[in-house]
Each structure stands twice: as structure tokens, then as C-alpha cells.
Amino acid sequence: MSKHHDAGTAFIQTQQLHAAMADTFLEHMCRLDIDSEPTIARNTGIICTIGPASRSVDKLKEMIKSGMNVARLNFSHGTHEYHEGTIKNVREATESFASDPITYRPVAIALDTKGPEIRTGLIKGSGTAEVELKKGAALKVTLDNAFMENCDENVLWVDYKNLIKVIDVGSKIYVDDGLISLLVKEKGKDFVMTEVENGGMLGSKKGVNLPGAAVDLPAVSEKDIQDLKFGVEQNVDMVFASFIRKAADVHAVRKVLGEKGKHIKIISKIENHEGVRRFDEIMEASDGIMVARGDLGIEIPAEKVFLAQKMMIGRCNRAGKPIICATQMLESMIKKPRPTRAEGSDVANAVLDGADCIMLSGETAKGDYPLEAVRMQHAIAREAEAAMFHRQQFEEILRHSVHHREPADAMAAGAVEASFKCLAAALIVMTESGRSAHLVSRYRPRAPIIAVTRNDQTARQAHLYRGVFPVLCKQPAHDAWAEDVDLRVNLGMNVGKARGFFKTGDLVIVLTGWRPGSGYTNTMRVVPVP
């Protein structure tokens, strides 16, 4: 323990410190210790999909307390009225904590577009009816609208009019996240005959994948345009754009959002082979990336998904863009109160790979244990963050960052380096547009980044970046700039103390600007907590 005593009583975060100081990655792994406590703060954002299991105001309040940072609305399902109700509930739940600036947690709202996806029709009977497709059986896949609402085990309608043109005999059609696979035997004018390779129970309106086929659907469908406009009206904070295949698709989404929606962050979901191949141009055009492993695992072989995940996380970390890891992270918790060991490892490894956010889909939307799932992700993420080999990561990101004459970037790198040197308990950053906080986040400090801002949207969007803990300052700006800086720094200090990030006597690093306005962060101080 002597190592910690050298640091004085100031250092409260043991969080695998012994391992963090190792010289090599191997030595770092050897020193990891299951008895070392992680920090109070969690650096990774948690995104929860809101659905029937979680949309009541009371449930949402509990989700926020358990650690939800971003509420995701999936526009593949539900009407605008339904989503409007959910947005209202999320805001009401968030505002219920607003009376006290210390405990207030901004929660962002994300609109996930349906995108250019292909879906099956309705099974005849009710909306919840299912039919069994048996292995080896013949199934006719048709475009004939007469079957749109009465599919059964013999005929399946799909909504993609060019189906016949893009698939050949011998191709495969996957339905419902790849659970059901069909082999194309012959082609007709408006149908294909298939043989069921992998059967199962089939419900209504399930997703269809055609791996390898050159699907020519527009990047932004008519429904997407209506949904995005609705999102702008509702003032959502970010859009998760589905099935992005090239940079032009991102520009198309941006165009629909228009002038009024120019502050909305666009996160591109990479879900097929083309998206992976053209990753660099997509990343360049987007505000961030989501590794959508569900569809990706059907479009490319399942055993290659981890390669795509690591490549995308690596490139986003190098470029300083946020990246979200999604799909099946704690899938078994839809029905069980505890995750499988594999899922626990998966969440931890996404964090170790360098993901900024981790996401829950069915676990919180329709599962039996939505709160437990959020708490589980929170607990695993904290442990994994403590086990990061920060030193190597910082040096490598520094080596790869382009040398440009931007003072804020130099400040950020210097502040993070100083935070390692003095074992700072936190970095407090004043930020209007959020840029200063994002730059610091890029260098991945061990300590949380308390970002104090007066802009409520900046506060909500800050959750996309690893380590940024937004604090919304509601006090009116002070006439004297220096006084105003002190006022905000003190708010950051009070929040950090109240949340147990640090205590009196600990060192924190404070980043401020010496004149008002956005883009002038140029002063760094190392300050003991009063």
C-alpha cells in the first residue's frame, strides 16, 4: 500500500493504481487486483432504449437514478404520438431532479431512425400471432400486396420492391436478426421460392437481411424524413442514423435536419459490409459512430464482428470521435435478473476497447429487469475503466494526434498529462459549446471530467464523450468575468464533493478561459479542493 501513501491522503482512488503504473501491458495485466475498488464516477455513458417496460415517469426516474444518461427512442416501432408521450415523460422525470443543481442529471434524447430496412408483413390473425417455419419446408416470399397483412407458414410478404432484381438462386434471405434463414431455390416475376434452412417461430414485421446483395434503398426513406422533422420539432439531442453505407447518406440526414436541427448530433450506425469498408468517409462526415452489432453480425460473418468493433473503436479514438457499442450486451437480462458471464465480459471489453458509450436495447425497452440491467452495466463499466492501461493509451493518442496550432488542444493534452502526474481526482472544465470538454475526453484521463456549462443542450450531448460528467449552471452570469469563472468552478467543486468524486485537500485540475465566449480555453490551474 506504500504506493498510495506517497500520494498523501489526497488520493482516494485506489482504482487499480498499482496496475496503472506498470511499464508494459503484460505487467499491467499481471497487477490487476479484484480487491481494488473502482472510483465512484463512471466514465462511460449508458444509453437505454425506452419501451413499454420503461416509459412511465416513475420507472424513468429510477432509470436515471440507476445511471441512464441517454434515452433512445426506436422509430422502427410506434407512432409519433407514442414517441411524443415518451419524450414528455423523459423530460418530466429529468426535471424532477432539477430543483437542486448538485443532484441534477441532464438526460439526452436520441432518435433512432428506421432507415432503409426491409421488413416482413403481418402474420394473419392478430399483431402478436406467430407461425412456425419448419426446417426443409418450402416458403414463397412474395411482393404481392394481397399478402401484406396475411402471411402464414406458406407465404411471406416483404416490403422491398426490388427483391427479385438483387437476389439470385442460391442466395440467402435472413429474417428476424438472422434467426431464420431461407435459401432461394427459384425466381418468379414477383416472388421467389425458398427452402427454410433454419426454422423457428416467426412474428409480424420482422427485419430482413440480404447479405451480399446490392440493396438500392434510399439512405433516407419517406418515413425517415417525417421522423427526423418530428425530431427537430421535439428538440431531440441526437440522431442514430440506421444503415449508413457512405458519407453521402450522412449528408442526406443532415440536409433533412436543416438549419433548425443543425445542433443535433448525427451518430451513424454501421450495420453492413459496405459501411465497414467505407468507414473512414462515414466517420469524417458524422459526429460519432455506433457499432450496431445485431445487423452487422448477419451482414458479415459473426466471427468477424469483433474485428469490426475493435477497428471502429480504434479509429474513432484516434480521431477523437465518440463511439457507441450496441446490441445484445446484456441480452439474457431481458428474462433473467443476472447476465451470463459472456455478457459481463462483453460489456467490460467494449469499455476496455475504448467505447465512449454502451447501449441497452430490449433489456430496458421490453425486458423484465430494466433497472437491474442499467445497474449491471454501471457496475461493470466502473470496474473496466479502472483496469484501463491509461498510460499507454495517453501516449499513443498523443503520438497520433496531429500537431496543429489550436491552443485548446494543447491545453487538453497538457491538462491530462498533469492529471496523471499529480494524481488529480478530477478535471473541472468550463465549456460553452462542449468543445473544451470533448478535447480533454479524447486524451482519456483516469479522473472524471466535470464539465460546467450554461447551455442545457451542451450538457445533455456531453454524455456521448467518455469521462465527461456534465454540470448545468443555472445561475445568471456575473458581470465580472473572473467572478463568473469562480462561481462556475465552485459549482463544479460542490458537485464533485457531493458525489464523492473528491474531498477537501484533493487536487483537481481547472481549465478556464481568460475572456468570455466560446473557444478561448487557455488557462490551466492545479487547485486543492477547498
UniProtKB/Swiss-Prot annotation:
K(+) binds at residues 74, 76, 112-113. Substrate binds at residues 72, 269, 294-295, 327. Beta-D-fructose 1,6-bisphosphate binds at residues 431-436, 481, 488, 515-520. Glycolytic enzyme that catalyzes the transfer of a phosphoryl group from phosphoenolpyruvate (PEP) to ADP, generating ATP. This is Pyruvate kinase PKM. It holds the Pfam family PK_C. It is an enzyme of class 2 (transferase). GO terms for biological process: cellular response to insulin stimulus; glycolytic process.
